[in-house]
Amino acid sequence: MFITSLKNQKEFELINKLGKKFHEKYFILVIAKNIPKIFLESKYNIFLGIKVSKKLNKKAVVRNKIKRRIKHLIRLICNNSNLKKLAMIIIPRKGFDTADFSVLNHELSKAILDFYNPKK
């Protein structure tokens, strides 16, 4: 399972435009599947973009901790499930840094599974 980060503003805008948004208590997830401009001839399965604002916390140490937690959550979820050709942007909200890891894992996996298995 290969995970890489979104590199430029155009990729972020493309995912925001074509992706589906899930608003959870601790984060906003924008997720899209099979976007050809990014996935064309790529060995990577998952493209991840993380937007951590200074409004969330002024200290860079805390913002970096949030990014590390998000990357670890994505690795756990992707190793447990068979996700392919997926691009997502995660925007954490207030309380993300103090939230329990198991709660974050449950919410994120629920949002990703809702994307793959939409309710009718």
Curated annotation (Swiss-Prot):
Catalytic reaction annotation: Endonucleolytic cleavage of RNA, removing 5'-extranucleotides from tRNA precursor
Record's GO cellular component terms: ribonuclease P complex
Protein's UniProt keywords contain Transmembrane: no
Single GO BP term: tRNA 5'-leader removal
EC number of the protein: 3.1.26.5
Annotated InterPro entries: Ribosomal_Su5_D2-typ_SF, Ribsml_uS5_D2-typ_fold_subgr, RNase_P, RNase_P_CS
Pfam families, per database record: Ribonuclease_P
UniProt record similarity statement: Belongs to the RnpA family.
Subunit structure: Consists of a catalytic RNA component (M1 or rnpB) and a protein subunit.
Protein name from the UniProt record: Ribonuclease P protein component
Organism: Rickettsia bellii (strain OSU 85-389)
